[in-house]
Structure formats: C-alpha cells, structure tokens
From Swiss-Prot:
The gene is pelA. It is an enzyme of class 4 (lyase). Its cofactor is Ca(2+). Its main location: secreted. Cleaves unsaturated trigalacturonate from pectin. Activity is highest towards polygalacturonic acid, activity on methylated pectins decreases with an increasing degree of methylation. It comes from Thermotoga sp. (strain RQ2). Belongs to the polysaccharide lyase 1 family. This is Pectate trisaccharide-lyase.
C-alpha cells in the first residue's frame, strides 16, 4: 500500500508539472553564481540542510522551532503560514527552507544572522506593507535579511510590496545567489552593503552576490544597489510600470546601482521602461546608476551578452579599466547566458514561487 501510494503521488506530480509548466526540483539542486563557490568550510558550496531531518511545518511556531534549531534541517513550508503579529524570525546555519502546496509566509520575515549555508526556495512572501509606514522608517521589516552570513541561495521566491527590503544583504555577508525570484510593487528591493561607513577593506572582501533570471515588476529602486563588493547581474527582466495601490514612491526610479567602489557587471538583461508616452514626456526609467560619496564601477555586457533597453534613459557606466568588465564572473564560477531576446518569456514563465515541484519530498510526507 505504501509503495502504491508513493507511485500515485509521483504520477500526480508529473501530470501536474506538465499541466502547469512547473519545474521538477530536487533537494540536491545546486545554485549558479556566487552561492556555488566552494570555501574551506563549505567545499561543495551552498547545500543547506541536505542530509538533515526533513520536517513539515504549517504554523509560525513550527517554522520558528526548526529555523532556530541547531544542526541540519530541511524545513518544508506546507501551505500558508500567517504571522500575527507581524515579525521576523532568525534562521541558523545549515537549513533548507522550501515551499510546497502554494506555500506562503504572510507578515513574516527571515533573518539570517551570523550563519552560513542556508537555502530558501519556492515561497511566496507578502503582508509586510504597513499603511502607517510606507517608507519603512518605523518598522524596518525585511522579507529576507542576511547579516554577517555567507553561502545563501534564495531561489524561486515571490516578494510582494514590503515596507523596507525584500532581500537585504548586510554586515559583510558573502557568497550569495538570488535567482528566479519575482519582485512585485516593491520600493527598496535589494540592498547590498549596510552603509557607506563600513570598513572598506573588510567590505571589499565581502558582498559577492549574483542576481540572475529574476523578474522585477513595477518596482522602484535597488534592483539591486551594491556597496563595496562585487555583483553579477544577468538575464533578469525589468518590467517597469506604475506602482499601484500604495503610497510613497510610485514611479520606478532606477534598476541596478553601484556605489562605494563596488564592481558590478550587468549582462543579458532586458529593461522595459514605462512606455513611449511617458518617455516622450521626459519621464523614463534609469536602468543602471552610479551612486555614492565614493562612486562604484559598473559595466555592461558586449556582443552576445548585450542588454536591451526600451523606453529607458541612457544607462550610467563606469569601468575600472576601459574596454574590460568591472570583473570577470567566469573567474569564480561557470554560467551560461540565455539570449537576451528570450529573457522576458523565460523569466515571466519561470520566475517566482509555485513553479517548483520537489519529487524527493513526496515519499517523505
């Protein structure tokens, strides 16, 4: 009976994947980008809680019990978890947090502090927008916040309109990949680097981050904004329109920004501004920006790695050395660019929560 039930579940899983265009996923999947880079303490790069106990959670209390437990865990968010009151919880090292059954975290955020080796996949985050604090000055809630942590992979998650950051990377965090995520109606999407006053030598060795195949829809700024470190931004789709249903900033301002000597390479991305009418009126989206009391470096891909810009302002760039990328990502990891003309369809179809089906979890449930 047990075998028959498992076979039936797997067949249902495959059939559902075919109908919905879902992607088969595994707990053994590896990230692309800086999260894959091996170090002495993590020779295989980011593997999360692989090999640890698999637990299914359905309440905020159950989720926090395992995110704050010592040791390896694969934590499966089954359905919707609502935090009341709204709050953030801590995530310790060696955790994989994945969602099934349209997993949502409502009114809750994850703080990865003084930790390493964390994976978060296939979860929809919402409910952190506070009407009395549209600029995030009072509550400072982030959906995901990494502080003094390394080797983190955030994949196939959706983030909807929070007060402060959707994914913020601070306090010298390092070796992080944000991939195949969807950001909707958010203002300050993703900040890398805590402040201009961080130690430049220490910060310059940290903050290695990859963003690839993400969908930024009607967001305002920081997609991402990087201080000090290195960021590789490739094959993302920026679809900029009016941010509706919220107070605060309404029109998108800029996409990728580099400050405080950061080295940022941007390639194979598709930037779509507000449209012809707005562009003709002089209101246009700035796809890349150089910022800060100390300017950063930012370069654009060439040839097959070119970006595409529609109804945008002229992108701002600043090379470290003329004719060369700000840094060469291939020196750190292997990756393959999708053709830029294919990016909108690939990313819209594939990014965000609810797109992954974990076959290796079916027999564990």
């Amino acid at each position: 009976m047990r075998f028959s039930r498992v076979v039936s579940l797997v067949l249902l899983l495959v059939f559902t994947a075919v109908l919905t265009g879902a992607v088969k996923a595994s707990l053994n999947d590896k990230p692309v980008g800086f999260a894959s880079v091996p170090t002495a303490d993590l020779p295989e790069g980011t593997v999360g809680g692989l090999g640890g106990e698999i637990v299914f959670v359905r309440t905020a209390e159950e989720l926090e019990k395992y995110t704050t437990a010592e040791g390896k865990y694969v934590i499966v968010v089954d359905g919707t978890i609502v935090f009341e009151p709204k709050r953030e919880i801590k995530v310790l090292s060696d955790k994989t947090i994945v969602g099934i059954n349209d997993a949502k975290i409502v009114g809750g955020g994850l703080v990865i502090k003084d930790a390493q080796n964390v994976i978060i996949r296939n979860i929809h985050f919402e409910g952190f927008y506070m009407e009395d604090d549209p600029q995030g000055k009072k509550y400072d809630f982030d959906y995901i916040n990494a502080e003094n942590s390394h080797h983190i992979w955030i994949d196939h998650c959706t983030f909807v309109n929070g007060n402060d950051g959707a994914v913020d990377i601070k306090k010298y965090s390092n070796y992080i990949t944000v991939s195949w995520c969807k950001f909707v109606d958010h203002d300050k999407v993703s900040l890398v680097g805590s402040s201009d006053k961080e130690d430049p030598e220490q910060a310059g060795q940290a903050y290695k981050v990859t963003y690839h195949h993400n969908y930024f829809k009607n967001c305002i700024q920081r997609m991402p904004r990087i201080r000090f470190g290195m960021a590789h931004v490739f094959n993302n789709f920026y679809s900029m329109g009016l941010r509706t249903g919220v107070s605060g900033n309404v029109f998108p301002i800029y996409g990728v920004a580099s400050a405080m000597g950061a080295k940022v390479h941007v390639e194979g991305n598709y930037f779509m501004g507000y449209g012809a009418v707005m562009a003709e009126a002089g209101i246009a989206f700035l796809p890349t920006r150089i910022m800060g009391p100390v300017e950063g470096y930012l370069t654009l891909g060439e040839g097959d790695a070119k970006n595409k810009f529609y109804y945008c302002k002229e992108p701002e760039t600043r090379p470290v050395e003329e004719g060369k990328p700000a840094f060469d990502p291939h020196e750190y990891y292997d990756y393959t660019l999708d053709p830029v003309d294919d990016v909108p369809k690939i990313v819209v179809d594939g990014a965000g929560a609810g797109k992954l089906v974990f076959e290796d979890l079916m027999s564990s449930k």
